């Protein structure tokens, strides 16, 4: 277990795609990555050796050529508070983006000094 405000593990990497269905066929059928789940028509997820790969079509105003690093954290609220106190410029506070069968997915997005998007991600299990 790591202390709040300590980042130690990449959980997810986001890659932009223009055609999610075409990209799914490539990553699943050509590269052989295990398909996890999708939220059609914009998102598809794969397992890449324990790191999740998210393929997505860009939302207007959020289109950028780079990838997004998602850091896995246990307590997103405490980590957000610690990093914000260190001057990290958060775009969004911690917020729930999805409820899956067995867990919720929470994000808090921020930028590095070069304008690259990074995010904290927490997936607490439902009780």
Q: Where are the regions a protein language model picked out?
A:
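Short amphipathic alpha-helices within nucleic acid-binding modules
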Residues: 77-82, 116
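N-terminal beta-strand motif that seeds the catalytic metal site of vicinal oxygen chelate
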Residues: 1-21, 67-69, 122-127
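Short hydrophobic/aromatic beta-strand element in the GNAT-like acyltransferase core
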Residues: 52, 70, 107-109
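Short amphipathic alpha-helices in soluble, non-transmembrane regions
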Residues: 29-30, 81-87
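Core segments of cupin and vicinal oxygen chelate
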Residues: 7-8, 14-53
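Vicinal oxygen chelate
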Residues: 1-6, 86-127
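Conserved short beta-strand elements that form part of the metal-binding/catalytic scaffold
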Residues: 34-67, 117-123
């Amino acid at each position: 277990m790591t202390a709040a405000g300590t980042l130690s593990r990449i959980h997810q990497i986001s890659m932009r795609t223009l055609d999610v269905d075409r990209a799914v066929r490539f990553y699943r059928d050509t590269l052989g990555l295990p398909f996890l789940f999708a939220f059609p028509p914009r998102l598809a997820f794969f397992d890449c050796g324990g790191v999740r790969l998210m393929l997505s079509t860009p939302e207007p105003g959020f289109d950028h050529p780079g990838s997004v690093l998602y850091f896995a954290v246990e307590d997103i609220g405490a980590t957000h508070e610690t990093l914000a106190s260190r001057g990290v410029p958060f775009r969004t506070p911690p917020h729930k983006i999805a409820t899956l069968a067995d867990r919720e997915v929470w994000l808090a997005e921020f930028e590095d000094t070069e304008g690259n998007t990074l995010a904290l991600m927490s997936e607490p299990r439902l009780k």
